[in-house]
Amino acid sequence: MDTIGYHYVVEAAGCDPEVIADPNKIREIFLEAAKVGNMEVKASYFFKFSPMGVSGVVIVAESHISVHTWPEKGYAALDVYTCGEKADPEKAVDYILEKFKAKYAHVSELKRGIEEEDSTFTHTILTWEEKLDRRNGNK
């Protein structure tokens, strides 16, 4: 079966706590990430927890971008899932990590789509730590 979509599951650490504690800032980042990744925004919702933390989602025609943050730990759990040919989820992920000022990230890329007659499917694990280290001036 052809791939239906690409799902990036991202562990982002060393993020700027002020950025990932602000639902309005995250919404702004996600809306721009959708544009950078050539996605069509349909809706968005973000919720700020007390005393801290944000969960949110941007629904795009191609699927979604979502987040759960722990500012006290500098940590964000991100999902970027797209289907179709025109979207570039990797660009969206890279943009979000840059704006979150993530120092470390583990990115798992899952090729989505399996039919009943398919007996196996594979997932590829990617790590972008080296790229983040270079961007943060550590190499």
UniProtKB/Swiss-Prot annotation:
It catalyses: S-adenosyl-L-methionine + H(+) = S-adenosyl 3-(methylsulfanyl)propylamine + CO2. Disulfide bonds: none annotated. The active site is at S63, H68, C83. It holds the Pfam family AdoMet_dc. Keywords: Autocatalytic cleavage, Decarboxylase, Lyase, Polyamine biosynthesis, Pyruvate, S-adenosyl-L-methionine, Schiff base, Spermidine biosynthesis, Zymogen. One of its GO terms (biological process) is spermidine biosynthetic process. InterPro entries: AdoMetDC_C (IPR042286), AdoMetDC_fam_prok (IPR003826), AdoMetDC_N (IPR042284), S-AdoMet_deCO2ase_core (IPR016067), S-AdoMet_deCOase_pro-enz (IPR017716). GO terms for cellular component: cytosol. The modification Pyruvic acid (Ser) is found at S63. Is synthesized initially as an inactive proenzyme. Formation of the active enzyme involves a self-maturation process in which the active site pyruvoyl group is generated from an internal serine residue via an autocatalytic post-translational modification. Two non-identical subunits are generated from the proenzyme in this reaction, and the pyruvate is formed at the N-terminus of the alpha chain, which is derived from the carboxyl end of the proenzyme. The keyword Glycoprotein does not apply. The record marks E62, S63 as: Cleavage (non-hydrolytic). The keyword Transit peptide does not apply. GO terms for molecular function: adenosylmethionine decarboxylase activity. Pathway: Amine and polyamine biosynthesis; S-adenosylmethioninamine biosynthesis; S-adenosylmethioninamine from S-adenosyl-L-methionine: step 1/1. Signal peptide: none annotated. PANTHER family: S-ADENOSYLMETHIONINE DECARBOXYLASE PROENZYME. Heterotetramer of two alpha and two beta chains arranged as a dimer of alpha/beta heterodimers. This is S-adenosylmethionine decarboxylase proenzyme. It comes from Pyrococcus furiosus (strain ATCC 43587 / DSM 3638 / JCM 8422 / Vc1).
